[in-house]
Design a protein with these regions (language model features):
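Mature hydrolase/peptidase catalytic cores and their serpin-fold inhibitory cores, especially
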Residues: 1-183
Length: 183
């Protein structure tokens, strides 16, 4: 099935263009007027490249090279979208070797509690919403403890799967990363 999607447009100052990807940065300013955060949209140059393969293959060095070479203005048409994501972290942390805190016999959480306790669950949840009014993003992690007791000639149209990021504008370090597949 096909559906009509509104693609609000905007002029942005930071165009990203490399042999592998094209994109933009939408700046979000702090109270003093300096860029504090940026929303990044990236499209693989190869229209047939799977967006998940593209996102997986983009390493830190390549990303920082893109970030450091951003230049010029671009006109952007980006769909409005929103996502919620929730994950139980116990198994994820176990893969990373973090297991003792979940074992009542091994947990040593004396730095945060006066009694013997262990963590029974850890949940991470994120939310992002992008629309014509801007970007809203939030993330929270909860643990359950148990005690023994501008204008341009360039135009980018995001009308196919793409990758997005929220980045610290001063460093370019990604704070949120995701992909949009249903356009």
């Amino acid at each position: 099935t096909e559906s009509a999607v509104k693609l609000p447009s905007s002029s942005e100052r930071d165009y990203i263009g490399t042999p592998r990807a094209e994109g933009f940065v939408k700046r979000y300013l702090s109270e003093d007027g300096a860029p504090a955060f940026g929303f990044v949209g990236l499209l693989p140059v190869d229209k047939n490249e799977d967006i998940f393969d593209f996102a997986r293959s983009l390493d830190g060095g390549e990303w920082m090279d893109m970030w450091n070479k951003k230049s010029g203005a671009v006109r952007v048409k980006l769909p409005e979208f929103g996502f919620d994501y929730k994950v139980e972290l116990k198994d994820v942390l176990a893969v990373l070797g973090v297991t003792d805190m979940f074992d009542p016999g091994k947990a040593d959480l004396g730095g945060i509690a006066d009694c013997a306790m262990s963590c029974s669950r850890m949940i991470h949840q994120t939310h992002i919403e992008v629309d014509r009014n801007g970007t809203r993003a939030a993330a929270a992690t909860a643990a359950v403890f148990d005690s023994a007791a501008m204008s341009s000639d360039k135009v980018l149209v995001f009308d196919r799967p793409f990758m997005f990021m929220i980045v610290d504008y001063a460093t370019g370090i990604p704070l949120f990363i995701g992909v949009v597949t249903n356009i």
